[in-house]
Structure formats: structure tokens, C-alpha cells
Amino acid sequence: MKKYLGIVLMALVIAGCTSRVPQTEQPATIEPAVPTPSKPQLPPSESQPLPTPPKIQVPVLDWSAAVTPLVGQMVKTDGIARGSILLLNKLKNNTNGSLQTAQATTALYNALASSGQFTMVSREQLGVARQSLGLSEEDSLESRSKAVGLARYVGAQYVLYADASGDVKSPELSMQLMLVQTGEIVWSGNGTVRQQ
């Protein structure tokens, strides 16, 4: 019965479609598009120099003036034995622009080496250790577990983290010295980096 009712309903719908009177409408007029003449774009002639793009100006910061007093405070920390092995992590850029972090890390490395308090893990030794552990050269060791693993691999007792934040023209520098054995932060300090 339901099949019969469905067939009758379909027949009525189909019959209703054919009995509609078609409405006549005027066909839409199509106007052909008239192309507008345009001047062809010519490449600039060789006699006309191209404008030079603006250079990104990275501020020249005095890193050594900022890190030297902080290193001076750090070496006075109680409990740090002279000659302790220190692994220096790359400076992390958390500013609102681009910083030359390699210069900052080098200034920090030089200040620490000249203090005589620490025996620094050499860059060559650090590179070999990174390769052995499968860490890339670009890995900034933000993960404390990676830093501790690398420090233990090279035999370092301390890891120094450095971070620049705030305005790129005058960033705030913060440093933390971590004891590898326990993960304890044994010293931290802050300073402002000024332009040269």
C-alpha cells in the first residue's frame, strides 16, 4: 500500500511540473565588452637606476658593558668553586625585533672566560657533543632537560642561560646560573643593554 501511495504521489508531482504554463520573459541583452587601449608595461631602461630597498637597521648594542657587571656579581656567589666547568647556552631573543645574538653570546663567553672563576666548555667541544647527542647547531637548549643532558655529557657542573627581552633598542638582559646536579638556580641577575 505504501508503495502504491508513493507511486501516485510521484506521478502527481511529475504531472504538475509539465502542466505549468511557461512564463515568457524578454531575453537579456548582452553588450559586447569594448577593450580599452592601455599602454604596454615596459621594463625600466638600463639608464634608469632601480631604487635601493631600505636596509633593516639592527641597533648596535654594547653587550660587553652589560654583561661584565652581571658576571662580576655572579662570580661572587657563595658555593661556586673556582675552576668549575660552565656550559654557556646561546642568548635567547625575546625582544620585539631582531638581535645579533651571536655577538651577545660571544661577549658573555669572553667576560666569563676572563673572570677566571669558570672553566668554559669550548665551542668545539660543544659542537662535538651536540652532534653526538643528535642536537642541531640551531637548538638553543630552551628545554632544561636538553641542557642538563648536554652539560652532563661534557662534564659541566653549571649551565648559564641568558635572555634578552623588551624593546630591541634597549633590551633587558636576564641571566640564570643553574647547578646541573640538582637543577637549582644558584644565581640570577638582570641588566639593561645600551646602544653604543
Swiss-Prot record:
Q: Which Pfam families match?
A: LpoB (PF13036)
Where does the protein principally reside?
Answer: membrane
Q: Does the keyword Signal apply?
A: yes
GO terms for CC? periplasmic side of cell outer membrane
Q: Where does this protein reside within or beyond the cell?
A: Cell outer membrane
Question: Lipid attachment points, N-palmitoyl cysteine kind?
Answer: 17
Enumerate the UniProt keywords alphabetically: Cell outer membrane, Cell shape, Lipoprotein, Membrane, Palmitate, Peptidoglycan synthesis, Signal
Signal sequence range: 1-16
> What membrane topology does the UniProt entry give?
Lipid-anchor
On assembly, the entry states:
Interacts with PBP1b.
- Name of this chain's protein: Penicillin-binding protein activator LpoB
Native species: Dickeya dadantii (strain 3937) (Erwinia chrysanthemi (strain 3937))
